[in-house]
Amino acid sequence: MRRLPVLLVLLGAACGRGPGPQAPVPQSVNAALEQFLAAVKANDLGKMSSLWGTDRGPASQWMKTNELRQRVTVIQKYLDHTGYRIIEGPLAVPNRADLRSYRVDLQRTGCNQAVPIDVIRTRSGGWLVYDVHLEAAGSPGGRCQPASGTRQ
């Protein structure tokens, strides 16, 4: 019977804390892109939220929950793919030592779509997807849009 009060105190302390520790951000620029695109393909919005952000860190740590869910839902719809191929990158971005840019060929049913994706180095040293350039991704579910260097 003595164990019950101790157990209740421990449970109370564990429940009183904020959210658990966040998964560490990828330590390489390539891993950030690969993990993000895998999360897009798997429709894993939670994982996408932890791999997309700014130099401050993952959006899941600082963005309001409803806004974040809406944004990653839109990103997932626009970047949904059956496979991908890195066309070029990581490329340095002029005057931005913290950014690297890729051109990614998203493989979709019936076509491929080239999309630029920027990855940023966080203040803590990891890498996150920063800008997915949705304007280049074409309409979700629609025909692929012509883009330079892309075969239709």
Question: Where are the predicted features?
Answer:
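Sec-dependent bacterial lipoprotein signal peptides
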Residues: 1-13
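Exposed beta-sheet edge and beta->alpha loop/turn motif
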Residues: 85-152
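Intrinsic-disorder-associated interaction segments
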Residues: 22, 26, 61-68, 125-127
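Positively charged, low-complexity intrinsically disordered regions
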Residues: 3-4, 18, 122, 152
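Functionally engaged cysteine thiol sites
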Residues: 15, 53, 58-59, 137, ...
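Short solvent-exposed beta->alpha transition segments
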Residues: 30-31, 45-101, 107
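Short, low-complexity N-terminal intrinsically disordered segments enriched in polar/charged residues
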Residues: 15-42, 50
